[in-house]
Amino acid sequence: VWDSAPWPRTGAGVQWVDRIVRRFYRTGIRYPVWVFGLTIIGLGAGIPALWDVKVETNLQEFFAPDHPTRSDTRHFESIIAGTGNLDVIFETQARDGLKNPEYLAFMRSFQTWAEKLAEVDKSVSAADFIEEMHWGFNAEDPAFRTIPDDPKLISQYLFIYDGEDLFDFVDQEFQVSHVSLSINVHPANEIAAVMDRIRVYISEHAPPGLQWEIAGYSRLFADMEELLVKGQVYSLWGALGLIFLLMLILWRSLGSALLCMIPNISPILIIFIVMGLFGIWLDMATAMVASIAVGIAVDDTIHVYHGYSSRIRAGILPVKALVRTFSQAGRAVVTTTIILSAQFIILVLSYFQPTTHFGLLTSIGLWTALVFDLLFLPSILMLLAYKKKKE
């Protein structure tokens, strides 16, 4: 008749979460000056690391040093040529303009200069075909391994040559041609540095009437990296601005909106400090971390501050308002952080470095946001309440 099952115990389930929450917010309430001061000192000490964050992307570094992709690339580049590619496009306005000996001679001189760069292993252009034919039709005399001075002779060589591969380097109107450079560097910044030197050389030495531009896969990669990272940085600032605006509309108070931004900006600082300290690049993968961390962190801040402010308006004392708020919302924000960070931390097991960094930094951002909401935010609220009471 009687139910003999044991009564539920208060320590079951996720009761341990409540103990963690209490320990954090009670520390923030009891020692607000210490918590606030030590947090500011800690962030200040980490600020110099922000200048060590390097904006860089290198596809080779996305894999471990012993990964077949990297080892095979190193082997190929050691015996043949660099796998990177830059194409310098040359164009004239007139038909057959690239049969001009001056233009062809400049293309060859540019190749000679480029091949002296440590980053360039090899170069090929239409001028190589003409130079080779001029040398071959003159008994392979080394003195004739040059571009002929007579445009008519160049036309005759091209008339005789029937290889289709020539038109891989020049169009059939002989108005557009390109010099293909095989480069052995892969970081976007180093590729950009090579392109800058090429631009300087051509700008100083190109003959009048010869238009030029740099293209190729490596140029695309360098530009893509720059545009992507800049776009992500701009989107981060846009997200912060939008969050601040929504906070302002929600709380109808400039001070409250600014206050709620502190726990949301702090994870970003911590993420970039960690990146600077451990040499993690800001690349196309890690650029997304800050925006995601902010988007998730703002949810916890709204839970905490909404509960606190609504109780303050009801006439409850600040200490009791914080205690009741965390008693109600503390378990939820901690459990949410545990679940989300567990999903992201699994990515650390990946062999692909961007995925590993993405999962690690996102988890760090989530836990940082939680600590700031449970510890730093209560200390600020207590200091503000004390200041208001004193006034």
Regions found by a protein language model. Name each.
Residues 1, 277, 281, 343-360, ...:
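Transmembrane helix-loop junctions at the membrane interface of multipass transporters and ion channels
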Residues 1-43, 313, 378-391:
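Interfacial helix-loop-helix hairpins and adjacent transmembrane helices
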Residues 26-30, 226, 230, 234, ...:
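Alpha-helical transmembrane segments of multi-pass membrane proteins
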Residues 32-284, 382-391:
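Extracytoplasmic
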Residues 236, 240, 265, 269, ...:
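Hydrophobic transmembrane alpha-helical segments of multi-pass transport and channel proteins
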Residues 244-247, 264-265, 281-305, 342-345, ...:
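Hydrophobic transmembrane alpha-helices
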Residues 257-278, 293, 357-374:
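Small-residue-enriched core segments of transmembrane alpha-helices in multipass membrane transport
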Residues 261, 296, 313-351, 370:
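Pore- and gate-forming transmembrane helices of large, multi-pass membrane proteins
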